[in-house]
Every structure is written in structure tokens, then in C-alpha cells.
Regions:
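Terminal targeting signals and extreme-terminal segments of soluble enzymes
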Residues: 1-185
Length: 185
């Protein structure tokens, strides 16, 4: 859960009557921490883990609360996230920072790979290639990011993902990844 609060700003250096300083904003969020050792987690496949997170029986990754996105769909070789841009994600030019899109893409890519991993294995991203197509503004409605696993082998995996505007159907960014597949035991 994320909440926003706007408060009046005291005198700010550089603010003038014709260009007053904007009010300060505060953003807070809460998340359920995932215990370091979840009983039975090592016996679950990647798809089972993601389905449990989607259903709420396992906590979602804390990164999703931090940046304002969520897992919305998961299936064999596929994961979908939706993210909400906002003015808390702006870069110095006033558009949403590319790191938001890169993180959204990396989450969908890795989760798509994870859906194809058996129990006792995990993955880590070793390469991420992101292509930004158009800028995202603070008032851009939700973005949908769908990741698809292309290859999942014993030691490596690859996937691709796209970020599409839910309001306009336009492509905002796309990416590919290579992941290392790791045995936990």
C-alpha cells in the first residue's frame, strides 16, 4: 500500500512570487517482509512461488511496493506486471526515470524465466538490454509489462519483455535478458 501526502513548504531559496516553490510531498509505503527462510519454499517450483505471491499466500517482492508496480498474471513461461508512473519517479528532465522501466522489465523477464524453473533452482540476471522507445510522463496511466521466456536450460536462460501503455496500446520500452540458472542444493 502506498500513500501520498502534500504539505506546505516553508520559504525555499530561489522561490519568488512569480515562481513559488511547489509544496513538499511525502510518499510512504508498506510491505510484508518475506522471512529469510520460508518453510517449503525450496520444494516449490518457480511457477508455484509466483502463483503463491500473486494469490497473497507469499509476500510480494518488496521492490514492487517501493516503485509502485505489481504482478498481475503468471503462467508457464510468462509473467505480467503493471506499474504506475508518478512524479516521485521523475528524472531531472521531468520524465519518469528510465530505471523505473528497466526495473519493471527486469522483473517481468526474470519472473518469466522463474516460471520455468524446477524446485531447488533460482536465477540471477547476468545481462539486461533495454530499449526505450518513448518517454513516460508523471501522469501517464498504468503501464503493462509482459515477459516471455525464450529459452530455459540447465545453466542459462533468455527472455524478452515489452512495456505497453494500458491507455494507448503504444510500445514504451522493450528488453531482453540472459540469466544464470543456479541450483540451490
Amino acid at each position: 500500500m502506498t500513500t501520498y501526502e502534500t504539505t506546505a513548504r516553508a520559504a525555499v531559496p530561489g522561490a519568488t512570487a512569480s515562481a513559488p516553490a511547489a509544496p513538499l510531498r511525502t510518499r510512504t509505503h508498506t510491505w510484508e517482509p518475506r522471512p529469510a527462510s520460508v518453510p517449503g519454499l525450496a520444494e516449490m517450483s518457480g511457477l508455484e512461488i509466483l502463483r503463491a505471491a500473486l494469490e497473497g499466500t507469499l509476500p510480494a517482492a518488496s521492490m514492487t511496493s517501493t516503485l509502485g508496480f505489481r504482478l498481475t498474471e503468471v503462467g508457464e513461461g510468462r509473467a505480467v506486471f503493471e506499474g504506475d508512473p508518478g512524479d516521485h519517479l521523475l528524472n531531472p528532465m521531468g520524465t519518469v526515470h528510465g530505471g523505473f522501466l528497466a526495473t519493471l522489465l527486469d522483473s517481468a523477464l526474470g519472473s518469466a524465466v522463474m516460471t520455468r524453473l524446477p524446485a531447488g533452482t533460482t536465477y540471477t540476471t547476468v545481462q539486461l538490454g533495454v530499449h526505450m522507445i518513448r518517454p513516460v510522463l508523471a501522469d501517464t496511466p498504468a503501464l503493462r509489462c509482459e515477459g516471455t521466456a525464450l529459452h530455459v536450460g540447465r545453466t542459462t536462460a533468455t527472455a524478452e519483455a515489452r512495456v505497453i501503455g494500458t491507455h494507448d496500446g503504444k510500445l514504451y520500452a522493450h528488453a531482453t535478458t540472459t540469466c544464470a540458472v543456479l541450483r540451490l542444493t
